[in-house]
Amino acid sequence: MNKVAIIGVGQSKFVRQYPGSIRELVFDGFREAVGDAGLTAGDIDASVVCSAPEYDKQRSPAGVLAEYLGLNPQPTFYVESLCSSSSTGLRLAYALVTSGLHSVVAVLGFQKMSEISSSESQERM
């Protein structure tokens, strides 16, 4: 079994209403994480995208984000488990590395709830 470690972390600005797109939001955190790890997108051999589409009006963001971040043609997985999406994504990345299927996996968790009104957000919880 391969050893696993989190080697870089990043986070976009935490604001009430992010002014950019979902791609830009994820890129901000991704850029910080790969810088923290001393990696480039080319060093990553798989990615896990984690979100809840009910809140950000983006039904299937995995492929779009992987392409935007320069992670293609590597495998990209999509995890959707509402509030636990990112922790579920970390578990998937752990399994991918311990199994030997992949060596370096980026986990990209995001939520942009400002795309819908507060009342809509509460209805969807």
Which functions belong to the PLM regions below?
Residues 1-76, 95-99, 106-125:
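Conserved "HGTGT" condensation-loop signature of ketosynthase/thiolase-family condensing enzymes
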Residues 76-86:
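Active-site nucleophile and cofactor-binding loops and adjacent substrate-binding regions
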Residues 87-95:
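Conserved phosphate-binding catalytic cores of ATP/NTP-utilizing and phosphoryl-transfer enzymes
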